[in-house]
């Protein structure tokens, strides 16, 4: 298995699909990386030689991926919460922060329903 940015790329996957296993690299960015490294997108990961892997590693290193990106996202959410703005307040309360309705729905963000003592 090829190892790029601390992630094992599956051997039997095309390199474009394998690059998407790295957090922060989607379909478009994976294609751009392959073009910049002069590698055909439909090449299997097991068919790459060491020079091609080094070229891919150099291209991926130009982007913020994996741990650094996760840390940046976490820090920006923490900054919003410390600032006390509306979005930070919604993050702190575990509610949607992009204007969705919450009277019904929003179960993913709010979690499972809490039981309320009913009348008997």
Swiss-Prot record:
GO terms for biological process: translation. PROSITE patterns: RIBOSOMAL_S13_1, RIBOSOMAL_S13_2. GO terms for cellular component: cytosol; small ribosomal subunit. InterPro entries: Rbsml_uS13_C, Ribosomal_uS13, Ribosomal_uS13-like_H2TH, Ribosomal_uS13_bac-type, Ribosomal_uS13_CS. SUPFAM superfamilies: S13-like H2TH domain. Pfam families: Ribosomal_S13. Residues 96-120 are annotated as: Disordered. Keywords: Ribonucleoprotein, Ribosomal protein, RNA-binding, rRNA-binding, tRNA-binding. One of its GO terms (molecular function) is structural constituent of ribosome. HAMAP family: Ribosomal_uS13. Belongs to the universal ribosomal protein uS13 family. Located at the top of the head of the 30S subunit, it contacts several helices of the 16S rRNA. In the 70S ribosome it contacts the 23S rRNA (bridge B1a) and protein L5 of the 50S subunit (bridge B1b), connecting the 2 subunits; these bridges are implicated in subunit movement. Contacts the tRNAs in the A and P-sites. Part of the 30S ribosomal subunit. Forms a loose heterodimer with protein S19. Forms two bridges to the 50S subunit in the 70S ribosome. This is Small ribosomal subunit protein uS13. The gene is rpsM.
